[in-house]
Amino acid sequence: MIRGIGVDVVDVARFARSAERTPGLVPRLFAPAERSLPTRSLAARFAAKEALIKALGGPGGISWQDMEVVRDAHGDPSFQVGGAVARVAAARGVTRIHLSMSHDAGLATAFVVTEGEGA
């Protein structure tokens, strides 16, 4: 059963300017393994994290570090979650998180669907 849906779009150039103006932004938003990725990939991961927050109902008090976008052996993206994000997901009955990301024409987009059992 679908528990939540979230989508987000990020302007890659605007994200790059923000990261350049604010040196602490990338370390605050991303796990160590994510930080060395190209700007377009970071923008897509930021969109993914925003989309996950929306799919979970906009929980406050989370740490960006509680969400990491990882890729499996086939290159498909997914989330590793911990801390407050994992607690909110469990409290809302979320047992699976689906993620799709893309970047093209200066925009990064992410779409998240959360699933769980029951009503």
Swiss-Prot record:
Its EC number is 2.7.8.7. The lineage of its organism: Bacteria, Bacillati, Actinomycetota, Actinomycetes, Micrococcales. Mg(2+) binds at residues 8, 50. InterPro entries: 4-PPantetheinyl_Trfase_dom, 4-PPantetheinyl_Trfase_dom_sf, ACPS, Ppantetheine-prot_Trfase_dom. One of its GO terms (molecular function) is magnesium ion binding. One of its GO terms (cellular component) is cytoplasm. One of its GO terms (biological process) is fatty acid biosynthetic process. Keywords: Cytoplasm, Fatty acid biosynthesis, Fatty acid metabolism, Lipid biosynthesis, Lipid metabolism, Magnesium, Metal-binding, Transferase. It is found in: Cytoplasm. Its cofactor is Mg(2+). It catalyses: apo-[ACP] + CoA = holo-[ACP] + adenosine 3',5'-bisphosphate + H(+). The keyword NAD does not apply. The keyword Lipid metabolism applies. This is Holo-[acyl-carrier-protein] synthase. HAMAP family: AcpS. Belongs to the P-Pant transferase superfamily. AcpS family. Transfers the 4'-phosphopantetheine moiety from coenzyme A to a Ser of acyl-carrier-protein. Gene3D superfamilies: 4'-phosphopantetheinyl transferase domain.
